[in-house]
Curated annotation (Swiss-Prot):
A Gene Ontology BP annotation from the UniProt entry: xanthine transport
Cross-referenced InterPro entries: NCS2 (IPR006043), Xan_ur_permease (IPR006042)
Subcellular location: Cell inner membrane
Catalysed conversion reaction: xanthine(in) + H(+)(in) = xanthine(out) + H(+)(out)
Protein species of origin: Escherichia coli (strain K12)
Function: Specific, proton motive force-dependent high-affinity transporter for xanthine.
Annotated PROSITE patterns: XANTH_URACIL_PERMASE
Cited Pfam families: Xan_ur_permease
GO molecular-function term, one example from the UniProt record: xanthine transmembrane transporter activity
Gene Ontology CC, one term: plasma membrane
Domain of life: Bacteria
Transmembrane region(s): 43-63, 71-91, 93-113, 126-146, 156-176, 192-212, 222-242, 260-280, 352-372, 379-399, 409-429, 439-459
Name this protein carries in UniProt: Xanthine permease XanP
Main localisation: membrane
């Protein structure tokens, strides 16, 4: 049976005809007011998460204001294009569900590490960014290949392995969040890092996020990040803490996307860590698409479900390739949008097309990314600390899908020790061969490889 025969195509609320928690199903076309309302909820739930990875990477690498503005704009634009590809489902590409795409946090740590190494080696901004985006294009093929052999990949990258890697990603990112809370790298250079006003501003944002997430009103919970950051921005203005930049910014009304704006290069030492993160991202995508299928009241088993999984993972890899071509960072499915589907009762993928169009339009206006750049570092840090802690906690949740017996505890302990140890004391590899140094220089790669190897050589314990 085709998808169209399984789903209603009229715009009548399904609750009127069957026992369902949904108001509009996958192929329904809600009236314009309901469509716009649901689309705005999706945008509020994801907007901060789309722009933050690009902002963190650009700030950590010390990119000029104009380059940062360009990359943030392209993050919004690419997320919109990627969402259309994921939702539309052309042939084998795409899940065909209301799966909104956005910039992935998983790549923040390895890209900052790789970019810093290139910068230390004397690379200028165009050379550094060309190498990062070129390596991302090559590494994204990993996810496309995995989409064709999902059954094999899931045997090697078990919940234990992927959970450990996600934990390392989250724990590595907490340092980035704390750096922003203290005032960022600029504050380090002028000896104002950790100033009481920075900690106060970040603390207010953090407290607001916690407070809003404890409210019974679901709309406040969905918009908690946006509300808290807006309040933090207003408080920063009142305290005279808005950043002042004398660097020139794009004055054009419309920003025309330029493929390969920085050129094309490859940084081979960064390839393996990025490939490993793409492997983990592919499994996260499986979980996100399964959750989307579930809240959309679609099958979570059988041929249609498997087709959507393969199409979704393939689209994820393709979208990350497209994102790199348009000079921004990898895309992945956003799990928070599943909460919006439950909140609104609208699973119609036509709402997703409206969200995608909103993202594209926002990305074409440089004024949006220009405003984002003026968010004070402590405001960003207060918000991202919650996000990064959540990533680490989600790794714990993934690991807990398997029995935490002696074997599992040993694998987790050794993998975390190796991954975090290499990150915290990189000189441990100073006498290692160059190939091994490149292989294990990333804590994510070191911990992930350790988890994969131990998972394969330690036989599972009998229950």
């Amino acid at each position: 049976m085709s998808v169209s025969t399984l789903e209603s195509e009229n715009a009548q609320p399904v609750a009127q005809t069957q026992n369902s928690e949904l108001i509009y199903r996958l192929e329904d076309r809600p009236p314009l007011p309901q469509t716009l309302f649901a689309a705005c909820q999706h945008l509020l739930a994801m907007f901060v998460a789309v722009i933050t990875p690009a902002l963190l990477i650009c700030q950590a690498l010390g990119l000029p204001a104009q380059d940062t503005q360009h990359i943030i704009s392209m993050s919004l634009f690419a997320s919109g294009v990627a969402s259309i590809i994921q939702i539309k489902a052309w042939g084998p590409v795409g899940s065909g569900l209301l799966s909104i795409q956005g910039t992935s946090f998983n790549f923040v740590a390895p890209l900052i590490m790789g970019g810093t190494a290139l910068k230390t080696g004397g690379a200028d901004v165009p050379t550094m960014m060309a190498a990062l985006f070129g390596t991302l294009m090559l590494a994204s093929c990993t996810e496309m290949v995995i989409s064709r052999v999902l059954h094999l990949a899931r045997r090697i990258i078990t919940p234990l392995v992927s959970g450990v890697v996600v934990m390392i990603i989250g724990l590595s990112l907490i340092q980035v969040g704390l750096t922003s809370i203290g005032g960022g790298y600029a504050a380090m250079s002028d000896n104002t890092f950790g100033a009481p006003k920075n900690l106060l501003l970040a603390g207010v944002v953090l407290a607001l996020i916690i407070l809003l997430n404890r409210q019974r009103n679901p709309y406040l919970r969905v918009a908690s990040l946006v509300i808290a950051m807006a309040a933090g921005y207003a408080l920063a203005w009142f305290m005279g803490m808005l950043p002042e930049s004398n660097e020139p910014m794009t004055q054009e009304l419309i920003m025309v996307p330029t493929p390969l704006y920085y050129g094309l290069g490859i940084e081979w030492s960064l390839l393996l860590p990025l490939m490993l993160v793409f492997m983990i991202t592919s499994l996260e995508t499986i979980g996100d698409i399964t959750a989307t299928s579930d809240v959309s009241e679609q099958p979570v088993s059988g041929p249609l479900y498997m087709k959507r999984l393969k199409g979704g993972v393939l689209a994820n890899g393709l979208n990350s390739f497209v994102s790199a071509v348009f000079n921004t960072f990898p895309n992945s499915c956003f799990g928070q949008n599943n909460g919006v589907i439950q909140l609104t009762g609208v699973a119609s993928r036509y709402v997703g097309f409206v969200v995608a169009l909103m993202l594209i339009v926002l990305g074409l206006f440089p004024a949006v990314s220009g405003f984002v750049q003026h968010i004070p570092e402590p405001v960003l840090g207060g918000a991202t600390l919650v996000m990064f802690g959540t990533i680490a906690a989600s790794g714990v949740r993934i690991v807990s899908r398997e029995p935490l017996n002696r074997r599992a505890i040993l694998i987790i302990a050794l993998s975390l020790a190796v991954g975090l140890g290499v990150s915290q004391q990189p000189l441990i590899l100073q006498f290692a061969p160059e190939w091994l140094k490149n292989l294990l220089s990333s804590g994510i790669a070191a911990g992930g490889i350790t988890a994969i190897v131990l998972n394969l050589i330690f036989p599972p314990e009998k229950q």
